[in-house]
Design a protein with these regions (language model features):
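Cytosolic catalytic domains that perform sulfur/thiol-centered chemistry
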Residues: 1-195
């Protein structure tokens, strides 16, 4: 994972609520054994509709997905997070996330930013009016700023998850940051346990 303090980008308005992981990436994509190539499966069913927002050329360079409430509900699948990231998104802003999806996001370096619905609606309106609207997510201050509409909103994040983003650590990285303590502990183990 890379260290993230500030995310600056443009957004894409996904005006849908209760988006489940099967809608994010259909189950037939889960048969793959490698961890790459999932971007083509992102919202695959919806992308058949030429009016679907991901097909709108105005948002081709968006790096922040702005969705409705209850994003990522349904079964746990890291593939959903991988598809979102591999498509080019660095963060998802929504009023709420399923717990499992939020945890999968933080473990894989995709920022899950929970804002109040009224703030999300203001961001939707801004990016629909101007696709170049800049969104700044500050992972240190835990704020989202959209200067063009004078919006600054704070979002919650558990301290250990904020620590992951600020320091670029996944589960293995966190474990390795304690390697001296682990080695010290292991050196005190009876030898019959190590043979």
């Amino acid at each position: 994972m890379k260290s993230v303090r500030i995310l600056t980008g443009t957004g894409i308005p996904l005006r849908r609520s209760d988006v489940d992981t099967d809608q994010i990436i259909p189950a037939d994509w889960l048969k793959r054994v490698e961890r790459t190539g999932f971007e083509a499966g992102l919202f695959a069913t919806w992308r058949d509709d030429r009016n679907f927002v991901l097909n709108d050329e105005r948002y081709v360079s968006a790096t922040i997905l702005v969705a409705g409430p209850s994003f990522g509900v349904g079964s746990s699948r890291e593939h959903a997070v991988w598809a979102i990231q591999q498509y080019g998104f660095e963060a998802v802003i929504a009023p709420s996330f399923s717990d499992i999806f939020r945890n999968n996001c933080t473990k894989n370096g995709l920022a899950p930013v929970a804002l109040a619905l009224d703030a999300v609606e203001k961001i939707w309106a801004a990016i629909e009016a101007d696709a170049a609207t800049e969104i700044v997510i500050d992972m240190e201050r835990l704020t989202v700023e959209v200067a063009s509409i004078s919006l600054t909103a704070s979002f919650p994040m558990e301290p250990q998850n904020q620590y992951r983003f600020l320091n670029g650590l996944d589960d293995i990285g966190i474990t390795m940051s304690h390697s001296e303590e682990i080695a010290s502990f292991e050196s005190t183990r009876p030898t019959w346990l190590t043979n």
